[in-house]
Curated annotation (Swiss-Prot):
Name under which the protein is recorded: Class I hydrophobin A
Tree of life domain: Eukaryota
Source taxonomy: Eukaryota, Fungi, Dikarya, Ascomycota, Pezizomycotina
PROSITE patterns in the cross-refs: HYDROPHOBIN
KO phenotype (gene knockout): Leads to the loss of hydrophobicity and significantly reduces dispersion in both air and water. Disruption of all 7 hydrophobins leads to altered germination kinetics, decreased survival under exposure to extreme cold stress and increased mycotoxins patulin and citrinin production.
Signals that turn on the gene: Expressed in spores.
UniProt keywords, alphabetically: Cell wall, Disulfide bond, Glycoprotein, Secreted, Signal
Amino acid sequence: MQFSLSAIVLGLAATVYALPPSAPVAGGAGAGNGVGNKGNTDVRFSVPDNLTVKQAQAKCGDQAQLSCCNKAVYAGDTTDINSGILGGTLSNLIGSGSGASGLGLFDQCSKLDLQVPILALLPIQDLVNQKCKQNIACCQNSPSSAVSTPPIIDQKAQLTHHRTPTSLVLASPVLPLAPSSKRLAMFSRIMQAALVITPALWTLVQSSTYAEMWIVIDSEDGKQAFD
């Protein structure tokens, strides 16, 4: 799953809202992400300490991915951002005004997958705040960044299915064998010779017939004249 810059926070619970920023604690940001936003001033959405990854994913639903995000831009009463890479993004995405309070844009997110604990006696491994020390959100893919993978086609199976059994065709007694090149050459020579000889024979036959006719006529005329 790929996460775009404009991943929408859908909320982990029905009562989730954006908390007001608290004062920085001594020593900088901490590592907590529990009730009351303990120890980390960069986290706006608080989650219960005993919330598991499975429960959090169930709150996200089937259309969103439970994620841990490093950067967050929150929307309050004013949602217009007119400069920088996020110019106008909040206003166009979730609308301007106080109705957008509690929502935000998240960046640098990685998904939180449900994993089977190594030891059944240590369910703490499945707690959300043990897997993510930053902002926990439900992120939805951008349609422009969705990736689809075509099904893998077994080309070997296709070639095997469409391959012609040439050995069976050549061994079949019904189908005649293809003529060799020598036979074709001999047949071509015979046909050429026949085309040359046939007109000559026809001319010879015609000339001999005419000669016999003239001989018969001459003999008859001579016989009549003689009589």
